[in-house]
């Protein structure tokens, strides 16, 4: 499509309306390059993406993308084997993190059915190993100590040396206070110095680094810290060298993945642009138009996007209609209507929402041409008419049946009779070539052309004779008429003069009366349509209100049912606990046999109501939330024992996880790390202990293995285990606690010592575990 139309209709200003919604530099670059497309499938794809984004906002109310810098130049430098600085690496780290977040967001999406965006989400790739390594770069663009063991060693020494220097200088501040101009430690050329009064400069031995502008203060590095400062200088040089080595290593890690990272960055930017299109559509009450396959245009309540308070108008350009001729006086809004049509087409063909109502339809043109405004060329010494005619000739040479042509004041700038004839001839040529055209003119001769010629329609802009001002309402099918007599009368021109003027133009009076009747009919039709739209809007509001009330009622009902169930469950749980206590006491007194106790417990449990929770929305949602908190590859974590951040890279067969923490790879169990994004701790699941029943102490005994348990968890399992053993009349059990630090072993001993049903306990023989296991005799 020709670029001149984009300048004429100020399409770049339209694109700037989307800038406030963008978060990434990549999306800004894509918006800058956005131009109208000429292939319907590509336009349809863009519209489908906006519809998909609308689904996300309807279901989840938001779609967050963090601010991302452009990394295109950094990736080019990587391809040229250059090393990146820390700010460039930080920008890439954010892209990797945002990619991982977006993948997780997509995996958690519910109740959405995408047409186009799914392919974008699924083409995103994550790099858990790279993310883990890049945790060594914090959000402030600083390398953390754990980036490498050498860097950690250097910084530890640096901290110690600086602390010693500060301590020495702090002591000197107290001892030499009368010699100092200020009671502080200053810094000159990276060295710690004291501000000494010039008169006492010989009282403190050391190196002079600076003198104040007044000459009253000398900045001296005391001899006591010279060696330490030299050491600090060397350590800082070592630190810079090690940081450079780490940045080189990080750059080498990225090089094999440049193409994939570039693709991820583009996808994130494109998603950001789609998000901006949706937000623009939502804030401006715009719509996604349908695409016609027969050059039909239907714009309902279309508005000019660059006007602050635009008047909405309907415009219908049917398949058979070749030209619309807007006639009438100037300053009525004819040019605005012409530009509104052009911009609606440019926006639609660029994949942008159109400022119109739902049901609007656009066509797909290979080119849009316009001759709008005074384009007189001073350099070419052309008159207004010559300039317009030169441009029109160019348009007629290039336009074809897949073009849209817009003419403003066609034939103006020359003799009215000749200008009108030229305008009609040009329109007739375009009509015979089946080129859709909209033209504005103030020549009355073109009204007759619009009435008498097939596939050509007149139109005009409404004028309020009461206020003597245009309303900017588009009246399709009604030619424009002159309002000169009405305006002259209202402005005080003598009635006899107006009457005489009317008699002089008597031949046109019948035409004006017909036009006046058409205007009245059009206004009446519009009033009826407006009333129908008002009723329709009221019905929509009522429908939304009913749906809202129903949803609120359903939600409250679910809450009440859940509350009732919980209260009932609490009563049942209380009864079961009481029954356990009673049965335990009976068992202690040997009044019941074990199988009778088990039967009795089964009968009591039958008293609990069996509630089908499979359809409970509240519980199902809770289960989904809980399930979503399970660790996944690519999750950011904090290693509990070290307090360092890392990223999960893979899960081993035994359930343990491999994580990348800085440049170190670690193997962790689930309880040795926490997820960074988890907002609430998961409840610990009740664990069941399988107990082997036995009637006496002979044969295999029940065992409880407490190795690897935390202290509180181990004590809870031990208490439950002993209760089960007593309930099942077991005479002897084994408790395996290991040796380790001895904490759990000591806890087991204390527990058994104070339990009234434990007759005897002792460590197992050496061949059966020794001090790592305890044999307990119950009775």
Curated annotation (Swiss-Prot):
Single GO biological process annotation from the record: mismatch repair
Domain named Smr: residues: 704-779
UniProt KW rRNA-binding keyword: yes
The name this protein goes by in its record: Endonuclease MutS2
Subunit structure: Homodimer. Binds to stalled ribosomes, contacting rRNA.
Similarity field: Belongs to the DNA mismatch repair MutS family. MutS2 subfamily.
GO molecular function: ATP binding; ATP hydrolysis activity; ATP-dependent DNA damage sensor activity; endonuclease activity; mismatched DNA binding; ribosomal large subunit binding; rRNA binding
EC id: 3.1.-.-, 3.6.4.-
Record keywords, A-Z: ATP-binding, DNA-binding, Endonuclease, Hydrolase, Nuclease, Nucleotide-binding, RNA-binding, rRNA-binding
DNA-binding among keywords: yes
Source taxon at top rank: Bacteria
Recorded coiled-coil stretches: none
PROSITE patterns associated with the record: DNA_MISMATCH_REPAIR_2, SMR
Binding site for ATP: 328-335
PANTHER family associated with the record: OS10G0509000 PROTEIN, OS10G0509000 PROTEIN-RELATED
Job description of the protein: Endonuclease that is involved in the suppression of homologous recombination and thus may have a key role in the control of bacterial genetic diversity. Acts as a ribosome collision sensor, splitting the ribosome into its 2 subunits. Detects stalled/collided 70S ribosomes which it binds and splits by an ATP-hydrolysis driven conformational change. Acts upstream of the ribosome quality control system (RQC), a ribosome-associated complex that mediates the extraction of incompletely synthesized nascent chains from stalled ribosomes and their subsequent degradation. Probably generates substrates for RQC.
Entries under InterPro entries matching the protein: DNA_mismatch_repair_MutS_C, DNA_mismatch_repair_MutS_core, DNA_mismatch_repair_MutS_sf, MSSS, MutS, MutS2, P-loop_NTPase, Smr_dom
